[in-house]
Design a protein with these regions (language model features):
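Small-residue hotspots at the loop-to-helix junctions and early N-terminal turns
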Residues: 49, 53-60, 148, 302-306, ...
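Intrinsic disorder in cytosolic terminal tails and internal cytosolic loops
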Residues: 1-19, 201-205, 451-462
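Hydrophobic transmembrane-helix bundles of small-molecule transporters
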Residues: 170-276, 282, 287
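Structural signature of hydrophobic alpha-helical transmembrane segments
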Residues: 62-64, 115-125, 175-187, 239-246, ...
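12-transmembrane solute porter fold
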Residues: 20-43, 62-65, 71-75, 86, ...
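Short helix-loop-helix connector
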Residues: 49-53, 106, 122, 137-139, ...
């Protein structure tokens, strides 16, 4: 088993202690850039497709980077465990930047699709490497705070990213949505570099066991994920066939990439990964329905419906901040259970807003509660993942956590799209069904939350 030597850093000094300051700023900046690019592309892509006459490749432009990201997460986990996070970090930034440059200078849509796929691979390498860096560079009692900072780094772009991207497209042109990001990504990773040098190299002398098989299963999962994403954007029989094939592929491949015992919610890490997937699926599945429901059933403008989502994002940030400041609960299950309970109650409350007799504030308050739950849950599950990982397992387990998140969310998004497209037009019944499904997933997670506790002592990180 590989081992690493982490530097001794006084936890009391906080995230901005002299030896952590640059790494904290650089890591949070990279997370923000990954989030901004993921959100900004959705705003820019209609203009891109028109400009490059590439509407036929529109779905692949989104499904491609999702698929390569799935593959990269597995590769990064193996690489981090075998050689430490420095290689995946540098290569991740390189692939991310090169992909953005290819996309930003693409003369035709097919070139942009290639750039997006390269960018997605870099994002997958980076996302796992950053988790491993947290496990090796930060003292354990700062993990809740750094993951809260990571959560905020995702939330802020969700508030301002689409608007900024729209302004860039309108006044500078769509290419700058891609070309502007490398100017910040390179300085951000340079800030992290000194801290990476102090982590020490892995002393592994042989490849991680089963690496080739994991990469093979990851390729299968990546293809299935791409089909799932593309199928979710189709209609009719085509959508059903693509989604069915993709789900079968994921059922075959994904369990080989997730912790043993995942499907039966075994205690410890398998349940941690499962809860992350259930929460992501519940939240994202509800999030895509809410604006449509409020605009069609309650006659809200797109701006007003979007503000409801903004309230949820702000509540997510508040929840992340709170979990990093409150005393460590006596039971490791407390924060995950509280978070999933909030998501359950909040999502079910939003479903009531389909009734015209109830005020719109029901939806606002419900989604705020759900967002608060996500803020309590996500960082706490990230912390648990590192606590349940020996040094040579941090990459694989961080990869599993993020894979579960992405694959669960993609599956529910595709199924939600199929439900909404089943009739001639979505109505109260379909909105209620999708929101109840989302609440049910969160409720299942809340009932399983006690199984994150292994019954034995939790391994320290580092």
């Amino acid at each position: 088993m590989p081992s690493t030597v982490a530097p001794a850093i006084p936890a009391a000094a906080g995230l901005f202690a002299p030896r952590l300051r640059a790494m904290t700023v650089g890591s949070v900046a990279l997370i923000s850039l990954l989030a901004f690019e993921a959100l900004a592309v959705g705003t820019a892509m209609p203009t891109v497709a028109r400009s490059l006459d590439g509407l036929a490749l529109y779905g692949i432009a989104f499904g491609g980077p999702f698929a390569t990201g799935v593959l990269a997460m597995v590769v990064s986990g193996i690489w981090c465990d075998a050689r430490g996070p420095r290689g995946p970090m540098w290569h991740g930034v390189a692939w991310f930047v090169v992909g953005l440059l290819i996309a930003g200078t693409a003369p035709v849509m097919s070139a942009l699709v290639v750039g997006r796929a390269v960018q997605g691979f870099g994002s997958g390498l980076l996302s796992v490497a950053l988790y491993v860096i947290v496990g090796q560079a930060y003292p354990q009692d700062l993990h809740r705070r750094i993951f809260a900072a990571f959560a905020a780094a995702w939330v802020v772009p969700s508030l301002v990213g689409p608007a900024i991207a729209g302004l860039i497209v309108q006044y500078l042109g769509w290419r700058w949505v891609f070309l502007a990001v490398p100017a910040v990504a390179v300085p951000a990773v340079l800030l992290i570099h000194p801290g990476l040098r102090s982590l020490g190299r892995s002393v592994a002398t042989s490849p991680v066991a089963g690496a080739a098989a994991r990469i093979g299963w990851a390729c299968g999962a990546a293809v299935s994920a791409a089909l799932l994403h593309i199928g979710g954007q189709q209609r009719g029989v085509t959508a059903l066939v693509l989604i069915a094939v993709a789900v079968v592929g994921l059922l075959v491949c994904a369990p080989r990439l997730l912790p043993a015992g995942f499907l039966r919610a075994a205690r410890g890490l398998p349940t941690v990964v499962g809860l992350r997937g259930l929460a992501s699926a519940a939240f994202v599945g509800a999030e895509v329905v809410i604006p449509l429901m409020l605009s069609r059933e309650r006659s809200l403008s797109p701006t007003a419906a979007g503000l409801v989502l903004t309230v949820g994002a702000l509540a997510w940030s508040v929840g992340s901040w709170l979990q990093g400041r409150i005393p460590v609960p006596a039971s490791r299950a407390s924060l995950p259970r509280a978070g999933l309970t909030c998501i359950t109650v909040g999502t079910a409350t939003v479903a009531l807003a389909v009734l015209p007799e109830l005020p719109i504030m029901v939806a606002v308050l419900g989604w705020a509660v759900a967002g608060l739950g996500m803020g309590l849950l996500y960082p706490s599950l990230s912390v648990l993942t590192l606590e349940l990982s020996a040094p040579g397992e941090q990459g694989r387990n961080s990869s599993s956590l993020q894979l579960g998140d992405n694959l669960f969310a993609a599956t529910v998004l595709a199924l939600t799209g199929a439900v909404l497209a089943a009739g001639s037009a979505p109505g109260p019944a379909s909105y209620t069904l999708t929101l109840v499904m989302a609440a049910g997933l969160a409720l299942l997670g809340a009932l399983l939350a006690g199984r994150v506790v292994t019954g034995g002592s939790v391994r320290p990180v580092g």
